[in-house]
Amino acid sequence: LVPLFVFILFLHKCFFTTSNNNKKLPPSPRKLPIIGNLHQLGLHPHRSLHKLSKKYGPVMLLHLGSKPVIVASSVEAVRDIMKTNDLVWSNRPKSKMADRLIYGSKDVSFSPHGEYWRQIRSITVLHLLSNKRVQSYRAAREEETSNMIEKLKQMSNSSSSATDLRDLFCWLAYNIINRVALGKKYNDEIDAKATLDKFVELLGTFNVGDYIPCLEWVNKITGFDSKVDKVAKDLDTFLEFVIEAHMIRNEKEENRAGESKDLVDVLLEIQNGKETGFPIQRDSLKALLLDPFSAGTDTIYTVLEWTMTELLRHPRAMEKLQNEVQGLAQEKAEITEDDLPNMHYLKAVIKETLRLHPPIPLLLP
């Protein structure tokens, strides 16, 4: 009887302890014990949420495991949350996965709202993503794009079979971000790409402990925790290798005239107090270096892949875009970023692709 009584208390604590207040809550679909409404999200949560909003309205309450979640599906509701009451909703739930992989969630995306977040956001906007800084990486973007096109030509000439563009786009995104963030392409050092790919994959993996805390032990049994620990360790080893290489190079004061600074250089200057009055710690520096990889790799190649897919599905659109490119390239060896302001149809194609296939259809909670 004692084990049964303890088990009943355990269930009550985990699943049935609720607030007894009489606050009016948004409409909500019926939830199941333990998992709440998780089963209703399916493989495409944004589509499932859209269907649920048709039934329960533009503002509804879901329970993802033990976590209550408000879902806003109309312009008015989103404006009220993100603009009118921005400070009320400015924080986000703690993510155990981000804590373990991103040094206690010290990056811009996952750090809690507060003075630290305001400082690193300011650093990111003013020093890492300013127009001047983005333009300084133009040569890297154009060179890697040319390399990809040349490789595509070689693959087309040497084989009669179909070419997998996804792999090419993936390497394009990875190489550009490597050069922008870390200063060069790291393809062989301690298997950098495999480690970074695992990092991005794990960051988007469902972690049962975040939603059903009393089932967190499942991760230990399945070996998931060990996998996360190994990736975190490999990631830290790689970032330490990159940072130490930059510090040694800077100490030697090697001639870098005309060479643009990468993100590691900028963050090291900030850490030394040369750029701002907010010196950042080593873990914060490494966390900020991971943001371009977590936010910029799969989003880039996914959009490129879907753009090509839609153009192949719509030959007339493909022909119209080809005519635009050929018109600009008549007297030029190649198209550059200077031509983008005149490529109106290309911009329309990209916007339509983003509308049909948004790489991140849901905002971070």
Swiss-Prot record:
Indicate the enzyme's highest-level EC class: oxidoreductase
Q: Which GO terms describe its molecular function?
A: heme binding; iron ion binding; monooxygenase activity; oxidoreductase activity, acting on paired donors, with incorporation or reduction of molecular oxygen
List the disulfide bonds in this chain.
Answer: none
Q: Which domain of life is it from?
A: Eukaryota
Which cofactors does the annotated protein need, by name? heme
Q: Which UniProt keywords apply?
A: Heme, Iron, Metal-binding, Monooxygenase, Oxidoreductase
Q: Report the PANTHER family cross-referenced here.
A: CYTOCHROME P450 71A2-LIKE, CYTOCHROME P450 FAMILY 71 PROTEIN
- Chain's role: May have a role in maturation, such as during flavor formation or other metabolite production specific to aging tissues.
Family of this protein:
Belongs to the cytochrome P450 family.
This chain belongs to the protein called: Cytochrome P450 71A3
What species is this protein from?
Answer: Solanum melongena (Eggplant)
Which gene name does the record give? CYP71A3
